[in-house]
């Protein structure tokens, strides 16, 4: 297989293709502008097609029903001042942490000057995820960590860009649909 996506300009760098590949044939490589794109190692690729199946650029967009749209405002003015978007992330993640769940989200790594996704089950870790980053985050091996937590029956909250959330959703839908077939 030559490439995962049909059009590189539509690739969001969600890493679903990299994580779903059973042959570890895909690596995420930075372009000149620092954006991560999947590159296939043709020597490892077995043309199974899983990467194309999970790639959201190969999917038709579905309409959003009004019933699936929600509005949040955190009822805590102190926390709202520390948050973005009305504190929805804080409100939802508080419940996850209270239920001994885990949160996956983006932090800005000051030492390496980049945004990365991490896992946390503590308030301080969650607080590091708050605020807007406005750059692509490196999702690394988060998919396997999410999978392990789900297998351990932990409540999981995944946050990221819409493209990253869709990538995670497609990955788990494909993974568990494939296993059941």
Model regions and ranges:
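Conserved small/polar residues in nucleotide/adenosyl-binding loops
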Residues: 176-181
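A short acidic (Asp/Glu
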Residues: 116, 167-171
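Gly/Ser/Thr-rich loops at beta-strand to alpha-helix junctions
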Residues: 85-87, 110, 158-168
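Long terminal accessory regions outside catalytic cores
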Residues: 1-13
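Active-site catalytic pocket residues across diverse enzymes, especially alpha/beta-hydrolases
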Residues: 96, 172-175
